[in-house]
Regions:
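Beta-strand-rich interaction surfaces with strong enrichment in secreted/lumenal proteins
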Residues: 59, 68-71, 128-132
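Glycine-rich, low-complexity segments
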Residues: 1-13, 32-63, 80, 100, ...
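Terminal beta-strand-rich extracellular "head" domains
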Residues: 88-136
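Beta-rich globular "head" domains
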Residues: 51, 65-101, 140-143, 157-163
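Extracellular carbohydrate recognition
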Residues: 149-157
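Short, surface-exposed secondary-structure edge patches
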Residues: 15-19, 76, 129-133
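Short hydrophobic/aromatic-rich beta-strand motifs
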Residues: 20-37, 83-84, 141
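Short beta-strand-plus-loop segments that form exposed binding edges in beta-rich domains
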Residues: 142-150
Length: 165
């Protein structure tokens, strides 16, 4: 089906729509962002931006170093979360990653993947963002500060979540 709109559409703010199995719903809530909830009840923030950045290939052991990946922000963005994952878990030590905007860290507690884990989601110390406002065209760089001591780890990726500002 296609909807053609001439003029404005307004949406009422609600905390969450009721789940309707046979249709999806668009709504806004207190975060002032557009959301979509599908018939199964999965809620997605439509305005969320997600960047996945590879800091290595899939088969080579990770190495410590600055500037493992970089890009310029295509627009200003407010970060809401950062995560990391790898395809081969580190052993013997934790993988630690720093994210920088224009050469300065944006993390007061760096992103980490604990030994024998594949994701930062289970890290004993969660990443803490100290700078969530990324400027348009800012240079974003990624450093690997620590790798596993027995098995370095492989296939490292960092995911940035946020919304345009």
């Amino acid at each position: 089906a296609m909807i053609t709109v001439e003029g404005a559409i307004s949406l009422d703010e609600i905390s969450a729509p009721s789940n309707t199995a046979d249709r999806g719903q668009l709504y806004t809530n207190a975060d002032n962002h557009l959301h979509f909830i599908n018939g199964a009840g999965t809620d997605v923030k439509v305005t969320e931006e997600v960047f996945i950045v590879a800091l290595s290939d899939e088969t080579t052991d990770l190495t410590i170093g600055n500037g493992k990946a970089s890009f310029h922000m295509p627009f200003a963005m407010t970060l809401t979360a950062v995560k990391a994952n790898c395809t081969t878990a580190p052993t013997g030590a934790t993988i630690i990653v720093d994210i920088n905007e224009a050469g300065s860290t944006i993390l007061s507690t760096k992103l980490s993947i604990d030994a024998s884990e594949l994701t930062s989601s289970t890290a004993a110390s969660a990443a803490v963002m100290s700078d969530t406002a990324l400027a348009n065209d800012a240079l974003i760089t990624f450093d690997i500060d620590q790798i596993g001591s027995s098995t370095a780890g492989k296939g490292l990726k960092v995911t940035l979540y946020g919304y345009r500002t």
